[in-house]
């Protein structure tokens, strides 16, 4: 059985507070896809892939935006209703939750990450040595 580590986090205004049970070595991705870039206005986002039931959060304080992803399956983006900070996305294609890593109070556990760049969708200013992970 894998060791789990409990961490807490919040959005910038503090209305969204959560706790999350992470694997001892969490799966952390830097996603360079067009969808993630447009969602944040940044070159990529850093997310943590969560197991089902790992996130404890008051969903009543979240706003949800739904849209089809590149596969045609639904993506649900969850934001704070007050400050509009992105909190997590649920990707139907993989039945996974991806928590925005920057919301954690303590990021010390996040020691390694993999780039998901969907080949030619990353910014040319980011020199990516690996080909990217197919998930």
What spans do the regions from the language model cover?
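A short Gly-Trp-Pro
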Residues: 1-10, 15-135
